[in-house]
Amino acid sequence: MPKPGELTFVAPRGVKKPPRHLADLTPAERKEAVAAIGEKPFRAKQLSQHYFARYAHAPEQWTDIPAGSREGLREALLPELMTVVRHLSTDQGTTRKTLWKLFDGTLVESVLMRYPDRVTMCISSQAGCGMNCPFCATGQAGLDRNLSTAEIVHQIVDGMRALRDGEVPGGPARLSNIVFMGMGEPLANYNRVVGAIRRLTDPEPDGLGLSQRGITVSTVGLVPAIHRFTGEGFKCRLAISLHAPDDELRDTLVPVNTRWKVREVLDAGFEYAAKSGRRLSIEYALIRDINDQAWRGDRLGRLLRGRPVHVNLIPLNPTPGSKWTASRPEDEKAFVEAIAAHGVPVTIRDTRGQEIDGACGQLAASER
């Protein structure tokens, strides 16, 4: 467990890397990998079709590939990366949390949420998190390691398969939104997260064919990485986990603020919004008597007025051993009104999954 305020930007050394997987590679790299084991390059396209378009991982499902080639291709490009430990469901089965065991025994979680008009999946980019926010169960656990691009992508592939196969009530469906708001700080695992976004949005069968506009990447505010992300030219939405409008409080709630202050973080976010043409999302967990004073709402509104932003207020979700709790309804209402008075769009998030520890800030990947 990290010490209060301690930050970890780099994953521990000596951690064994996951096996290479189709989803780690570009289409050109897949052809090279297939050729390296003596197979025709077009087999790479066939494998991509099975994985990204049909969600078919088992060699016996690849009927267009000779039986004698299947096992070699599986070993080279579709090794087993992760297995399901369990699913937990709530909301009549329309919210489902999955606990995954990775190849090395590491545990991570993802959450699928089906609404009447959309299906959203919250995915993890790291096992644990090094940002050490004291109100977040993931942050309090520390960082185990980064996930590979394929380990990130496979969470979505399995979610899409589950929706197609009717495992989630409501009939067959397709994912409409992906949010990098599960375990980890996405921009601290920059290259693999960017690789995952490319796999998710590459046209089928090279990728999953999802829209960049349906993807949200959340960050506590790693300013150099935000600038770098701006240069990628993505149309994803960027969400900044702000949680306080003043440096004095944010230094405590979001320890990375000791490196990059509120105005630096917001300016980097505004730059991304201008380049991408997407509104910046401001995430703010309301904590009773800590950051929910109306004057802080007023200060936040002043910082954001006239900017292309949307404020997402999150009633604090309980975590084991936490001394904090959600705001009183009257304080929440006054906070909303203080922000809205500056013409800044603000909503309170419809929190799901709290009963199964699947809501924002609750993912701890425990086998208990």
UniProtKB/Swiss-Prot annotation:
> Which top EC class applies here?
transferase
Q: Which GO terms describe its biological process?
A: rRNA base methylation; tRNA methylation
Q: What is its main location?
A: cytoplasm
A GO cellular component annotation here is: cytoplasm
- Where do the annotations place S-adenosyl-L-methionine binding? G184, E185, S218, S241, L242, H243, N317
Q: From the record, give the cysteines joined by S-S bonds.
A: C122-C360
Residues forming the Radical SAM core domain are 115-355
The cofactors named for this UniProt entry are: [4Fe-4S] cluster
* Cited Pfam families: Radical_SAM
Listed A to Z, the keywords are:
4Fe-4S, Cytoplasm, Disulfide bond, Iron, Iron-sulfur, Metal-binding, Methyltransferase, rRNA processing, S-adenosyl-L-methionine, Transferase, tRNA processing
- Provide the cofactor note recorded for this chain's UniProt entry: Binds 1 [4Fe-4S] cluster. The cluster is coordinated with 3 cysteines and an exchangeable S-adenosyl-L-methionine.
Give the catalytic activity.
adenosine(2503) in 23S rRNA + 2 reduced [2Fe-2S]-[ferredoxin] + 2 S-adenosyl-L-methionine = 2-methyladenosine(2503) in 23S rRNA + 5'-deoxyadenosine + L-methionine + 2 oxidized [2Fe-2S]-[ferredoxin] + S-adenosyl-L-homocysteine; adenosine(37) in tRNA + 2 reduced [2Fe-2S]-[ferredoxin] + 2 S-adenosyl-L-methionine = 2-methyladenosine(37) in tRNA + 5'-deoxyadenosine + L-methionine + 2 oxidized [2Fe-2S]-[ferredoxin] + S-adenosyl-L-homocysteine
Supply the EC number(s): 2.1.1.192
What compartments host this protein? Cytoplasm
**Residues binding [4Fe-4S] cluster:** C129, C133, C136
- Tree of life domain: Bacteria
Active site, renumbered:
E109, C360
Span-the-membrane segments of this chain are none
Q: What else is known?
A: Reaction proceeds by a ping-pong mechanism involving intermediate methylation of a conserved cysteine residue.
Q: Read off the PANTHER family from this record.
A: 23S RRNA METHYLTRANSFERASE, RADICAL SAM CORE DOMAIN-CONTAINING PROTEIN
User: What protein am I looking at?
Assistant: Probable dual-specificity RNA methyltransferase RlmN
